């Protein structure tokens, strides 16, 4: 997996995304989420009973080079509930949790709620089964921290799960429509969703190399380019937050071959709910696979 560089020194500037400090009311639960999509689920369930800081929150900048600030360190130290992806995707959070003073807190680790095994794709939020499990764990944590308002958390959990079920239903529809379609990607970011959709993913060795920040082999690059030039795939997916000369070249080859190209991100856009973000990406994918050039 790509190496994420994190500086824990107290006076190092944040180079990628500046997370605004959480100003919690006296009786609010203080929550810190490593990624903003988990923070969004916490807000949907917690409502005005929680104050949420999402550390990685800028979809316009690459998430693979990240440094933290004293403010973020302090917020994590004060958090009652911490939410992270796990799966070695955000291992910096473990370091921050261990660096501060020990205190009682609940840690919701998505990788421990699903059937994740070392070596599996770490982009767990793109698996439709992940967020419902995370939502239940978050609601349980809120109810334990604030039992007086447990009924409210339970009610909002039901609403959130119903919204997340729209993703499950949409995935089933698209699997019936496009299942088996050969596609490819520059990185495995969308891999869990592609698998759930029943799509046939090609050039996975290339994707693994890019995820691990290593140079793909000449053979794998040639195979990827050939798939595009010979139109052996119906779609190219790329990580729009991270690009280099090689991925840009592959995008250009795909466009010249009139293969649809769509971008996905590892960070959720601002001012949108998780379910709407994912459903929007699924709509874009459906349109691309249904088009005349697919």
State the predicted function of each range.
Residues 20-294:
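Extracytoplasmic metal-acquisition and chelation regions
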Residues 4-5, 20:
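Residue-level detector of intrinsically disordered/flexible regions characterized by low predicted structural confidence
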Residues 5-15:
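Bacterial N-terminal signal peptides
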